[in-house]
């Protein structure tokens, strides 16, 4: 019919879940409605489970609180952090989709230099659906982006690239700084928009931030454990970075790629640097040993699945990091519990995206 328009189906509409950890009403979703409404949301409520979290009308979502987590996982719920955004990884576990996008509730829609709203989810999907180049660096960054290609001297034998497991997005406005840097630069804002996506080279670690992150759950999901943080733990704000160090070791071993760069979101508010310092204090010292450990970690050739790799890594954590603090013994045990819980909710041999959502609390489905 003349003049009629057909709305295109959003990319991966039935293959992607959006995971949001929160302690507050999700009014921020109104800004994201044009981009998020077609997708299924998994909301992980942290803190007091009796508090009512209001979600704007029209979104398709499941909401899990601590009571739900305890009911679904039983004793294994001990591996899920409480009073820390690390609780988001429970959403990764109960999802049955191939892809995950996770975002914090203080992250708003950013604008590109032309003033156009950035569809962060769409860019993450493009990043994940295109190969990565972890084995040889392309000086034009992502050669698979429109308008780019492999530069002269890039080996033809390596141009197929590697499957992309992780897409790590960035932030305008409030940078993701540690507490000491926050204290020194309280007014600093990130205003630089860099139009680039690049693959992090094999053998190189990076500080992963969980506030604007997407990944292929089938490729790397079992390793996306955000550790033991928050209530009852001696450390906080290292959840995403811990996961990032682990997934990079495993991606390097399995020949998978990790991208960073676009898309940007607008990080709306800075957290309290004094509160952050209390959470980070031990981690600031511990990371000086965790990072060399991760840089030198190797996995046996017979570790061919993410679960096998992660369990092997947990053994090495217990063996080599427990001398720093008993916390690492506890963390290594939690890593094993996490894999056991993951495998219980995600039996092997079944199509992950086709499994029924058996674990969803029916009264909280929308």
From Swiss-Prot:
Keywords: Cell junction, Cell wall, Cell wall biogenesis/degradation, Cellulose biosynthesis, Glycoprotein, Golgi apparatus, Isomerase, Secreted
Modification after translation (UniProt): Reversibly glycosylated by UDP-glucose, UDP-xylose and UDP-galactose, but not UDP-mannose.
Site entry (Required for activity), positions: 152, 159
Compartments (UniProt record): Secreted, Cell wall; Cell junction, Plasmodesma; Golgi apparatus
Cofactor: Mn(2+); Mg(2+)
Domain of life the protein comes from: Eukaryota
InterPro entries, A to Z: Nucleotide-diphossugar_trans, RGP, RGP_fam
Role of this protein: Probable UDP-L-arabinose mutase involved in the biosynthesis of cell wall non-cellulosic polysaccharides. Was initially shown to possess an autoglycosylating activity which is dependent on the presence of UDP-glucose and manganese.
PANTHER family assigned: UDP-ARABINOPYRANOSE MUTASE 1 (PTHR31682:SF46), UDP-ARABINOSE MUTASE (PTHR31682)
Comment block on domains: The conserved DXD motif is involved in enzyme activity.
Protein name in UniProt: Probable UDP-arabinopyranose mutase 2
Gene that this sequence comes from: UPTG2
């Amino acid at each position: 019919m003349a003049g009629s328009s057909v709305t295109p189906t959003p990319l991966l509409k039935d293959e992607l879940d959006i995971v949001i950890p929160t302690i507050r009403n999700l009014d921020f979703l109104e800004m994201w409605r044009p981009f998020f409404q077609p997708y299924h949301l998994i909301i992980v409520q942290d803190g007091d489970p009796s508090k009512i979290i209001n979600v704007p009308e029209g979104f398709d979502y499941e909401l899990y609180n601590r009571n739900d987590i305890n009911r679904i996982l039983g004793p294994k719920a001990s591996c899920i952090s409480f009073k820390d955004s690390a609780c988001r990884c429970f959403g990764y576990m109960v999802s049955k989709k191939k892809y995950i996008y996770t975002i914090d509730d203080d992250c708003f829609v950013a604008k590109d230099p032309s003033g156009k709203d950035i569809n962060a989810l769409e860019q993450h999907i493009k990043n994940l659906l295109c190969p990565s180049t972890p084995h040889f660096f392309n000086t034009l960054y992502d050669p698979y982006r429109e308008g780019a290609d492999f530069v002269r001297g890039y080996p033809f034998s390596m141009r197929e690239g590697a499957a992309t497991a992780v897409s790590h997005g960035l932030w305008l406005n409030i940078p993701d700084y540690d507490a000491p840097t926050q204290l020194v630069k309280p007014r600093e804002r990130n205003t630089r928009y860099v139009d680039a996506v690049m693959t992090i080279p094999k053998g190189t670690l990076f500080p992963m931030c969980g506030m604007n992150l997407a990944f292929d759950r089938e490729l790397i999901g079992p390793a996306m454990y955000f550790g033991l943080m928050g209530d009852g733990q001696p450390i906080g704000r290292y959840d995403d970075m811990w996961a990032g160090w682990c997934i990079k070791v495993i991606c390097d071993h399995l020949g998978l790629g990790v991208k960073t760069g676009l898309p940007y979101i607008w990080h709306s508010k800075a957290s309290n640097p004094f509160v952050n310092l209390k959470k980070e204090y031990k981690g600031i010292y511990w990371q000086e040993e965790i990072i060399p450990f991760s840089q030198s970690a190797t996995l046996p050739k017979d570790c061919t699945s993410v679960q096998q790799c992660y369990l092997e890594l947990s053994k090495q954590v217990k063996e080599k990091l427990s001398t720093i603090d008993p916390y690492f013994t506890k963390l290594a045990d939690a890593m094993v519990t996490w894999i056991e819980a993951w495998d219980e909710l995600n039996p092997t041999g079944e199509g992950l995206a086709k499994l029924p959502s058996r674990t969803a609390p029916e009264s909280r489905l929308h």
